[in-house]
Amino acid sequence: MISQNKREKIALEIIRTLFNRFNSFPQDSSRNRNAPFHEAFLKAFSNKFNSNVSDIPYFISLSSWLHGLNTTLGQSFFEKIAHILSNGEKREYTTGKYGSLKISKTQKGNANSIITKLSNGVSIPNLVRENSQIFITDESDLVNAIDFSADLFFNDGDEIVAIELKTVKPNSGEMRGEKQKILEGKAALYRKFPDKHIEFYLGFPFDPTHDPNDPTGYDKIRFMKSCINMNKYFAESEIKIAS
């Protein structure tokens, strides 16, 4: 159950987002400098618009506004709501923030080996097996882990939970890089918090493949299949979808 205090904080974020977007809502399409070029191209699709679009310049302005709304939701709104719900924060282990973390050469080598085998199709994602290879303490030299951040980071008693929030349509080449970052991130957090259980996930705000009449529902297996290479690099247990 979400507390009243958290409900009020979420409501405030919604009001802020609405206020900012109301101020930028298109009123005059003539100010859209790109409209003449877009309009010329869109005329080629006029037979597909039918009666749904009567004002192409305004349609272009509205599309630009919607793109800005998508950016706002993806870059800040979902993240802020996640922080409120979990009492978490954004955490960046980079040279410019909390500093890069160290992992052992063995941990780094094991992470690279996991990635190579997944990329070549030699193995399939297996969270238990992968964790056993990176959650280790050994005497090999320490090296820098890849700089990484977690859009949502919180200490939940006996465990550290990190979640990288992504758009629901990630780029086709993202999955390998995200997996590499998460593997080294988990290895680094394991060394930094040796008495904690470490969890690191990819998180998504909703399932775009689900019935729009049931906006809080999801089908994780179907969603993962819709994302290029997600099943190649991630186990189902590594993915979180808001509901």
Each PLM stretch: what is its role?
Residues 172, 196-243:
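Domain-level recognition of nuclease-like catalytic cores that cleave nucleotide substrates
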Residues 66-69, 134-141, 167-173:
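Surface-exposed cleft-lining segments at the edges of enzyme active sites
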Residues 98-157:
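Active-site metal-binding core of divalent-cation-utilizing nuclease and nuclease-like domains
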Residues 86, 150-169:
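Conserved catalytic cores of phosphodiester-cleaving nucleases, focusing on short active-site segments
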Residues 2-5, 9-12, 140-142, 203-207:
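Extended alpha-helical scaffold and adjacent linker segments that couple domains
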Residues 1-102:
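Nuclease-adjacent, charged terminal/linker segments that flank catalytic cores
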Residues 168-189:
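Mg2+/Mn2+-dependent nuclease catalytic core
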